[in-house]
């Protein structure tokens, strides 16, 4: 869990915290995190719903090679809440919850656009989440979910005036581990060319998810091999 209290956040500006990690996310299907936002007590900046956003970045770095997912924030009114009012404190629309393959799909779309327009990978490319059209996905550079080295969580001011805001984030997690098994095939071919000689050919093919009986899920093959 983490609390971020941000003061005098200028229009279009952002503040964030990051952590260096080494993680392969390819065997997970979704990423989730609860998010709460509220106006700071005594604040006179007249903060409104959706004027600030929370975002998460995943990549080999947080400036040149990353995926970003951004969610507009609904504010929780000041007050006292009991356990039955949990959704008022942690609104569902604030929750970061999306399939990881959405990130790679946006990257694929970006690469097609670059090919057709002679663009560059260093220019941010954004699309909106088709399941949650208010949420935005951005890709910069050449990030790889198989080699995530940094994770960043931040808050951005989307309004035209400076804002103060308090944001809580909790239970960041990867879910829906891919337990589907793969398969492997081995072929050997020997051809006798009469008096000329003989030729032997061998081939092996393994799909993602294949592994030995003694191997754990994490030790199984993560990509196709042939």
State what each model feature region is:
Residues 176, 205-209:
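Transmembrane beta-strands of outer-membrane beta-barrel pores
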Residues 187-191, 226:
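Residues on the lipid-exposed face of transmembrane beta-strands in outer-membrane beta-barrel proteins
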Residues 1, 28-31, 56, 61, ...:
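Exposed low-complexity, polar/acidic, P/S/T/G-rich flexible segments that act as propeptides
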Residues 11-14, 23-32, 38-43, 49-51:
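Extended extracellular/luminal ectodomain segments enriched in beta-structured repeat modules
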Residues 199-205:
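Transmembrane beta-barrel strands of outer-membrane/channel proteins
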Residues 194-196:
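Outer-membrane beta-barrel channels and translocator barrels
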């Amino acid at each position: 869990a983490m609390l971020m209290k941000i003061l005098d956040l200028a229009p279009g500006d952002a503040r964030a915290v990051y952590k260096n990690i080494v993680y392969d996310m390819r065997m997970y299907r979704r990423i989730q995190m609860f998010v709460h936002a509220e106006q700071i007590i005594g604040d006179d900046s007249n903060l409104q719903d959706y004027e600030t956003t929370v975002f998460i970045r995943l990549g080999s770095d947080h400036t040149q090679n990353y995926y970003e997912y951004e969610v507009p924030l609904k504010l929780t009114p000041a007050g006292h809440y009991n356990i039955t009012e949990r959704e008022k404190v942690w609104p569902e629309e604030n929750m970061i919850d999306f399939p990881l393959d959405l990130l790679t799909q946006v990257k694929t779309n970006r690469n097609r656009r670059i090919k057709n327009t002679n663009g560059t990978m260093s220019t941010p490319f954004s699309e909106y989440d088709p399941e949650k059209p208010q949420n935005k996905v951005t890709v910069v550079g050449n990030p790889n979910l198989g080699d995530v080295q940094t994770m960043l969580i931040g808050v951005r001011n989307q309004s035209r005036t400076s804002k103060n805001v308090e944001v809580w984030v909790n239970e960041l997690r990867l879910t829906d581990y891919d337990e589907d098994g793969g398969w492997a095939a081995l072929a050997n071919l020997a051809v006798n060319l009469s008096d000329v000689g003989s030729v032997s050919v061998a081939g092996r093919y393994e799909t993602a998810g294949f592994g030995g009986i003694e191997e754990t899920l994490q030790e199984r093959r993560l990509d196709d091999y042939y």
